[in-house]
């Protein structure tokens, strides 16, 4: 498993988005999957209870299988979108490794999980998370929306932004910003750290 830098993963996510989407947000990851990539999204009851996984992508690149019970509620839509983007991260970043294991169902995925060394699996998952974050939260749009939300925050609270610790400010901003991108606040907080540098 090659180590990929954050910059390499960011570039891969940006290239993927440019190829399959446009500059609008939120990125319609379901449309990309079903229309552009012609993959099926298959809901599997009990996937999380039986195998402790939210979703997996098959090695044939024909399906993304998702836990039905976990994602049937509308409140999980943002998490679902992130899971889709995460699985696409495996397609883009780990295609060769996935193809070697021939993952076609949850049992195959469990075998894959058992056979890949723990640190290597952790690298893959971390890389797919980073990919999903960059895919769904383009930093140029994040920068502009952050400015807009900060202006609203200043107006509403009559406060000087420079007086607030950047990490605390990110926590305040993450909720309002997340609505623009169709993700939960946590990935926004992570993405905002890139703008604090």
Language-model features and meaning:
Residues 1-197:
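Active-site hotspot residues in diverse enzymes, especially metal/ion-binding acidic/histidine motifs
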């Amino acid at each position: 498993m090659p180590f990929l830098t954050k910059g390499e993963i960011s570039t891969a996510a940006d290239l993927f988005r440019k190829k399959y989407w446009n500059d609008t947000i939120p990125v319609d990851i379901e449309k990309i999957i079903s229309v552009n990539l012609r993959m099926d999204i298959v809901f599997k009851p009990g996937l999380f209870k039986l195998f402790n996984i939210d979703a997996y992508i098959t090695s044939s690149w024909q399906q993304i299988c998702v836990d039905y019970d976990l994602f049937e509620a509308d409140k999980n839509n943002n998490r679902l979108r992130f899971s889709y983007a995460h699985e696409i991260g495996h397609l883009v970043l780990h295609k060769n490794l996935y193809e070697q294991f021939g993952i076609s169902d949850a049992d195959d995925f469990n075998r894959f999980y058992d056979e890949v060394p723990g640190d290597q699996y952790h690298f893959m998952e971390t890389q797919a998370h980073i990919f999903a974050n960059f895919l769904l939260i383009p930093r140029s749009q994040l920068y502009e929306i952050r400015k807009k939300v900060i202006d609203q925050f200043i107006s509403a609270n009559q406060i000087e932004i420079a007086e607030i610790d950047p990490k605390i400010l990110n926590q305040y901003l993450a909720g309002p910003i997340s609505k623009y991108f169709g993700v939960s606040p946590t990935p926004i907080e992570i993405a905002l750290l890139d703008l604090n540098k």
